[in-house]
A protein has these predicted regions:
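Short, basic, alpha-helical segments at the C-terminal edge of helix-turn-helix-like DNA-binding modules
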Residues: 5, 30, 60-67, 71-74
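Helix-turn-helix
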Residues: 11, 15, 19-53, 57
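Solvent-exposed, amphipathic alpha-helical segments
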Residues: 15-22, 65, 69-76, 110, ...
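Hydrophobic/aromatic residues within well-ordered alpha-helical segments
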Residues: 51, 58, 62, 66, ...
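Amphipathic alpha-helical packing segments from all-alpha helical-bundle domains
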Residues: 99-106, 119-147, 158-165
């Protein structure tokens, strides 16, 4: 009986996910992946020309989806009138993170690969990219506050980077720990409240 179309590729992907999750990209063995998938090396190279290409096939779309969702939220917030930005500060970010949580929760193994197993690939910097976007957005928001007459102190860039990095790592920890989605959603809401209050204090609001 002929195999369903795509079954070989499905086996390669399943074996690759297990191998990358267990060992990370750098230590993962392409030979083990091929063996576990029950395919020949020639069959593998009919789909991918390298281990890196295989890893990219597993994570590229989700990786880019997260960045685009976050970027869209930032641009949407900045499209608001300055006065609206003040009233919506914190809420837009929490809404975005809840959306990302649902998306990432449905793909936990993939995001464990991205967050814990991607060293040595172009996909190892998800948190760094999110931090860069958030730091730039925070600085622009401070300028909005100043344009409205608020006396916002200059924030030390080192402190700003540490705070944003801590925030992004905290959000990602929710994905890395196995917990019911409802619990994760509550934690994300509470994290949002915590960091919003902290930023308001630092910004003198």
């Amino acid at each position: 009986m002929p195999q369903p179309i795509g079954s070989t590729l499905d086996r390669i992907h399943a074996a690759a996910r297990d191998e990358f999750l267990a060992k990370g990209y750098q230590a993962a063995s392409l030979r083990n992946i091929v063996k576990t998938a029950g395919v020949t090396t020639g069959a593998f190279y009919g789909y991918y020309d390298s281990k890196e290409a295989l890893f990219a096939a597993l994570v590229d779309e989700p990786y880019r989806r997260v960045l685009e969702t976050y970027r869209t939220a930032v641009f949407g917030f900045e499209a608001l009138r300055p006065e609206e930005q003040v009233t919506q500060m914190g809420q837009v970010g929490k809404t975005c993170m809840q959306e990302l949580l649902v998306y990432m929760d449905a793909r936990r193994p993939v995001f464990r690969l991205i967050l814990q197993g991607a060293e040595g690939t172009p996909y190892a910097g998800l948190i760094d990219e999110l931090v860069a976007m958030e730091v730039a957005a925070t600085e622009r928001y401070c300028e909005v506050l100043r344009s409205l007459g608020s006396a916002v102190p200059q924030i030390d860039p080192r402190l700003e980077h540490m705070l944003v990095t801590g925030m992004m790592n905290a959000y990602c920890e929710v994905i890395l720990h196995d917990m019911p989605l409802a619990d994760a959603q509550r934690y994300v809401e509470e994290l949002g409240d915590f960091y919003t209050a902290g930023w308001l204090k630092i910004m003198g609001q």
